[in-house]
């Protein structure tokens, strides 16, 4: 399993598409992911706080079956189903997702839906069949780790990119819901004794400009809001990201990415919200900065 990401086998047909089995990305990653800043130029830092919608493919689906269609005049679609692996309970720990994308000239659009049962175990855990204890919390980001007891996690999103000459404009929206909190027997701990649902809404706006074929600059603003839950105030995360890339050759480039995030309100753990840029440990304060400078060679 190369770097722990994907490992799968399957069949492919130029007439219908492909059918694969193994450890794979979900449909939100496949269809919306390519339109996000994290995939295009911003890397891990350019993704949402804690990669809450998994558009940056932090998590994969194990024991999954995936269908990916061929392109029908620019339209592609597909779905993923991951077996829960619990004897006698077919739906427990199951994961399924659907997605579609369309590309025509300068326009690219996509939409996807992800449904995860007992996500603290099935998605964030290393194995859906690992025994659960009362203290098992596989979620690490304080943005949502307090919702480990959710029976179901849902992600619904859509995105669009439009290119005008050397400029590309991007907009991505996602709604993330942790449903039926308090399911400690199957999902995870609930120290805050929460009940009901927790909902987040995220908007990512971006602008990429190619000054020359080799030199590009990207800007992003991301806003994540967690709705009030169980009498707690809402949480809000504002992030700005800047990226500069210079291609030294067809396979080698040097880039710098800088992100700044500021948080407010009450996070999922019931504490004052702290900044949580994706890819680094959450801050101990409400503000955080992350900078990456790298030389990249593609093999």
Model-inferred region functions:
Residues 3-5, 59-63, 92-96, 103, ...:
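Residues that define the transmembrane beta-barrel architecture of outer-membrane proteins
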Residues 44-47, 75-81, 135-141, 185-188, ...:
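Flexible, solvent-exposed coil segments and beta strand-coil junctions
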Residues 31-37, 121-125, 181-185, 231, ...:
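Outer-membrane beta-barrel and related beta-rich outer-membrane complex signature
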Residues 101-241, 297:
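Detector for outer-membrane/organellar transmembrane beta-barrel domains
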Residues 12-19, 71-75, 103-108, 162-169, ...:
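Secondary-structure transition into beta-strands, especially the periplasmic turns and strand N-termini
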Residues 248, 285-299:
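Outer-membrane beta-barrel "beta-signal"
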Residues 26-30, 84-86, 116-119, 176-180, ...:
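Structural signature of outer-membrane beta-barrel domains
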Residues 1-84, 92-114, 259-263:
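Outer membrane beta-barrel
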